[in-house]
Amino acid sequence: MDEKGERIPLTICDYDREAGTITIVFQPVGASTTKMKELKAGDYFRDFTGPLGNASELVEEDIEELKKKKILFVGGGVGAAPVYPQVKWLHEHGVDADVIIGSKTKDMLILEKEMEAVSGNYYPCTDDGSYGHAGMVTTMVEELVEKGNKYDVC
């Protein structure tokens, strides 16, 4: 972030090649992410390295085979960040995926519009019941399975 910053792992949630920008999602928990929270539109990091790690295994699979599968993604809180680019990639390749995203409250739910735009079915969950399914994401998975949904990839 600056000359005194540390290297921390962050998920690249989205990008805009034309604008030369990336979108990252984080929760302020330490010194670096707390500093990052103070940045405004147009601010920048002194240094950014990435992407690091491995791509989703889904990118290695045959698209036509993926289209035959019933795929479910489940994430909660900032765990929605790594779900979105995978679901978006599938959507761009004509593959539907269902998505369950949870948070403590409606106000803490992230990437909702983005998920709705690329999901086959989108199921928001809130622990406090303020929006969508009341309860944990795991109870939504159970409910879908009890209703007869079968998933090949989860």
Q: Where is each model-derived feature located?
A:
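FNR/FR-type flavoprotein reductase catalytic core
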Residues: 33-154
